[in-house]
């Protein structure tokens, strides 16, 4: 007896954080169709960020396991102030088979990105104090995105699958800065409570003003 496919519509809406982000991977036992994808310039003032949108296929076959092929749908497309770029308005099929895994990846380039030198995170309150290598030029109330901060966590079976925290697929509001605008290298935000799991900063990380937001609509087709 044939199994009727189960269809599910998804909407993914995330900020475009510094660096590369995998925003969606086709789940096991299904294929997916990207129906629509758009990036908007939500920056304050005259900003001209660019975005690259990639269809990534990773091999899982025995002979070529781990090989990756990047098919760039668009590369380095500039988005003017208060405007948006429609990347897909039709369909892009993503597969998950015994020999391949498909993902969609975005990478933004923008002004105002600075490197993070230290970060202190309190798991019980979510309060996060970030120090940058050079003055960050942020004000209290600004929205920022962060990516690539590596942490270690206390031992225990918490179901943690990554050492990167916080998630790059959300933005954060700056609660306060330490020092004066233009010379301050430290700001305070809230990255959310982590259910009593202590985090210790190791290295890395980038932070920048929120300038782009990505949204896409996906239809998943499952037979499992």
Language-model regions: role of each:
Residues 12-14, 21-24, 74-79, 87, ...:
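Generic detection of short hydrophobic beta-strand segments and adjacent strand-loop junctions
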Residues 40-43, 95-96, 175-177:
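Short linear motifs in intrinsically disordered
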Residues 56-109:
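Intrinsically disordered, low-complexity Pro/Gly/Ser/Thr-rich segments with frequent PxxP/GP/PP motifs
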Residues 32-36, 84-86, 127-129, 186:
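Intrinsic-disorder/low-complexity, polar/charged segments enriched in Ser/Thr/Lys/Arg/Asp/Glu/Gln
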Residues 110-214, 221-224:
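Small/polar beta-strand repeat architecture
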Residues 44-70, 110-123:
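Short beta-strand/loop turn elements enriched in aromatics
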Residues 1-32, 36, 40-44, 49, ...:
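C-terminal interaction-tip segments
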